[in-house]
């Protein structure tokens, strides 16, 4: 057996800090269960001290998700560490991840602390965290812009006082692979007792080099990689888990006997679940999980793949769970056929949940002849991944008049926090008129940042999936809606995004106060 590279997934912490990617507690829980199926080693469930919402999410995940180590981020402050420890109490296996900046620019302008004061803070934070768990990770924020000798001292201090994992973040995505690899090698050669801990890396993608830097670090001695599904994260994002894991698996000729315990057959499903939850879909040419990742249009390429797959493909689509067959269900399909297909897609439900899904499936099958996998995924999302049981805005009814040489007009009746309201409006089209009527009824006008709609499946009776990104008082949120009627799909997407913005507004403002002080 070779050497293991630990996969530390921070989708639910660093990943969801990106604008438009915030998740509710229930959504985080859905993702955490799937990450456990993916078999990542560590799930960073959130930043428990950031807000009540973050605390609840970390606590629920610690209580309900089994398998991976559950981790919470905490600044190098006793108050943060105590809150993280409290949130993690139910976890079978837990880790506290504490951090402080070590670069001159951060120490002088953000922390307003001397290097000696920072070292003292590291000592106290790591020692205090060890009172709650034997698994403590310490991160040197902005490590790649830190003075080398001071970085060594900071790491040595953390190890001396009980850190079990040392993380080297390229916080601003500044590093180039060759120099980042050299940094890891220098740390391995110059820090006493570095062999007693796991050396970790956390790379941002500002220069498009996060995956390359992470892999170079592994080659030079790092044995934990912090990454996110689809590479999501602040600014340009993080190293993509799927890219790091598959590079190590496919290029064993280069990386030797290094391996991960990730169940790669769950990669595609995990990627799709994140897309559904956040409403942000990966670009078609995204490595490993994009729609075109295993598509071939060139005649020469098609001929080669048909002759022998490995002529133009370096991995099997099945290795990442990429669906190669499309099973079509219809109105004559029974409960057993539906249950079997859902299980093949990786979904498992109780009898009561399956009854709900089957009822919705039959309604959908009556409206369209053929029900594809994409339809089933959308149906499950609509039924089981709503943002809240109580939504602030509920559209009760709407009617639209539109046609050739007519001004599109919409009338909407809705409920806002229990109060019924009604309004009418005209617009540049039926969707525009309906959205304006909703805004008029609510008395608010969020800024629409993006709107798109696409057919999920072939044929004119296909379900449409609408996606909306909006901003309400500085809070960005995305929503999606699915229906065979494109106006209904658009209304669902708009109200979904609006509800998310309303629910998250205070939550995000609270967390912003913490985030301004820095994260890795």
Curated annotation (Swiss-Prot):
Q: Which Pfam families has this protein been placed in?
A: HCS_D2, HMGL-like, LeuA_dimer
Name the Gene Ontology biological process terms: L-leucine biosynthetic process
* Cofactor names: Mn(2+)
Q: What CDD domains does the record point to?
A: DRE_TIM_IPMS
Care to name a GO molecular-function term for this sequence?
Answer: manganese ion binding
Q: Which reaction does it catalyse?
A: 3-methyl-2-oxobutanoate + acetyl-CoA + H2O = (2S)-2-isopropylmalate + CoA + H(+)
Stretch list, region Regulatory domain: 394-520
Q: Could you name the domain of life of the organism this protein comes from? A: Bacteria
Matching InterPro entries = 2-IPM_HCS-like, 2-isopropylmalate_synth_dimer, AIPM/Hcit_synth_CS, Aldolase_TIM, LeuA/HCS_post-cat, LeuA_allosteric_dom_sf, LeuA_bact_synth, PYR_CT
Major subcellular site: cytoplasm
What is the annotated localization of this protein? Cytoplasm
Which amino acids does the record list as binding Mn(2+)?
14, 202, 204, 238
Metal-binding among keywords: yes
Q: Hey, what's the signal peptide range on this chain?
A: none
Q: What pathway or pathways are given for this protein in its record? A: Amino-acid biosynthesis; L-leucine biosynthesis; L-leucine from 3-methyl-2-oxobutanoate: step 1/4
The record's Gene Ontology cellular component field reads:
cytoplasm
SUPFAM superfamilies hit by this protein = 2-isopropylmalate synthase LeuA, allosteric (dimerisation) domain, Aldolase
Q: What is its EC number?
A: 2.3.3.13
**What does it do?**
Catalyzes the condensation of the acetyl group of acetyl-CoA with 3-methyl-2-oxobutanoate (2-ketoisovalerate) to form 3-carboxy-3-hydroxy-4-methylpentanoate (2-isopropylmalate).
Return the NCBIfam families for the record: leuA_bact, PRK00915.1-2, PRK00915.1-3, PRK00915.1-4
Which protein family is it in?
Belongs to the alpha-IPM synthase/homocitrate synthase family. LeuA type 1 subfamily.
Q: What is this protein's name?
A: 2-isopropylmalate synthase
What organism is the protein native to?
Aquifex aeolicus (strain VF5)
This protein's gene is called: leuA
């Amino acid at each position: 057996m070779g050497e293991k590279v630990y996969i530390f997934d921070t989708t639910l912490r660093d990943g969801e800090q990106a604008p438009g990617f915030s998740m509710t507690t229930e959504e985080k829980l859905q993702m955490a269960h799937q990450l456990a199926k993916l078999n990542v080693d560590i799930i960073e469930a959130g930043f428990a001290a950031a807000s009540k919402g973050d605390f609840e999410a970390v606590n629920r995940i610690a209580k309900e998700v089994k398998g991976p180590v559950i981790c919470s981020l905490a600044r190098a402050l006793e108050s943060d560490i105590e809150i993280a420890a409290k949130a993690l109490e139910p976890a079978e296996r837990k880790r506290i991840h504490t951090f402080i900046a070590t670069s001159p620019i951060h120490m002088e302008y953000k922390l307003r602390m001397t290097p000696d004061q920072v070292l003292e803070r590291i000592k106290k934070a790591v020692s205090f965290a060890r009172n709650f768990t034997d698994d403590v990770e310490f991160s040197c924020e902005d490590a790649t812009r830190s003075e080398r000798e001071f970085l060594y001292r900071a790491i040595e201090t953390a190890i001396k006082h009980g850190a079990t994992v040392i993380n080297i973040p390229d916080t601003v995505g500044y590093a180039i692979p060759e120099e980042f690899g050299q940094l890891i090698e220098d740390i391995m050669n110059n820090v006493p007792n570095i062999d007693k801990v796991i050396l970790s890396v956390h790379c941002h993608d500002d220069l498009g080099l996060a995956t390359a830097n992470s892999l170079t670090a592994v080659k030079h001695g790092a044995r934990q990689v912090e990454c996110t599904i689809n590479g999501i994260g602040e600014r340009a994002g993080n190293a993509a888990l799927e890219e790091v894991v598959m590079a190590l698996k496919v290029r064993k000729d280069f990386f030797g006997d290094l391996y991960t315990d990730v169940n790669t057959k769950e990669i595609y499903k995990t990627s799709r679940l994140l897309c559904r939850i956040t409403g942000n879909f990966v670009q078609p040419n995204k490595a490993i999980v994009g729609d075109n990742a295993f598509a071939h249009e060139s005649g020469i390429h098609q001929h080669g793949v048909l002759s022998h797959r490995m002529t133009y493909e370096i991995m099997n689509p099945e290795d990442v769970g990429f669906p190669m067959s499309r099973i079509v269900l219809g109105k004559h399909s029974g409960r057993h056929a539906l249950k079997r297909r859902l299980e093949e897609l990786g979904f498992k439900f109780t009898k009561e949940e399956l009854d709900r899904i089957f009822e919705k499936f039959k309604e959908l099958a009556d409206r369209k002849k053929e029900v594809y996998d994409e339809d089933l995924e959308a149906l499950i999302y609509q039924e089981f991944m709503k943002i809240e049981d109580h939504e602030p805005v509920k559209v009760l009814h709407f009617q639209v008049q539109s046609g050739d040489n007519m001004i599109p007009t919409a009338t909407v009746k809705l409920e806002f926090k229990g109060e019924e309201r009604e309004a009418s409006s005209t617009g540049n089209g039926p969707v525009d008129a309906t959205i304006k009527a909703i805004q008029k009824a609510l008395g608010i006008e969020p800024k629409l940042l993006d709107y798109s709609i696409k057919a999920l499946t072939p044929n004119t009776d296909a379900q449409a999936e609408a996606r909306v990104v909006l901003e309400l008082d500085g809070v960005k949120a995305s929503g999606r809606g699915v229906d065979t009627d494109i106006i209904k799909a658009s209304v669902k997407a708009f109200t979904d995004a609006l509800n998310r913005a309303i629910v998250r507004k205070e939550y995000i403002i609270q967390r912003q106060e913490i985030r301004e002080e820095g994260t890795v």
